[in-house]
Regions:
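Phosphopantetheine-attachment site and its flanking helix in carrier
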Residues: 32-50, 69
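Thiotemplate assembly-line natural product biosynthesis machinery
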Residues: 1-23, 75-82
């Protein structure tokens, strides 16, 4: 899977969970997104693990503080191409 495919799928996931349109190049992080609370974070991780057919470690989950950070972690975790 290529990095842009990861970004596209994450954008779709964030759009569904945040209940608003999220742009692919939009910067989203926990500190600036009022709807990104602990429950949404759990939902996000479970959805990502299901959609990408992977399991993130506790350390990886703790580092998922933005859409870009999550994309980076997934890229490393599943061996994404550039």
């Amino acid at each position: 899977m290529k990095r842009n495919e990861i970004d596209l799928l994450l954008t779709q996931i964030f759009s569904v969970l945040l209940k608003r349109e999220v742009m692919t190049d939009e910067v989203i992080d926990r500190s600036s997104e009022p709807n990104w609370d602990s429950l949404l974070h759990l939902d996000l991780i479970m959805t990502v693990e299901s959609e990408f057919n992977t399991q993130l470690s506790v350390d990886e989950i703790e580092k998922c503080i933005s859409k870009d950070a999550l994309a980076e972690i997934l890229g490393e975790h599943i061996g994404a191409d550039a």
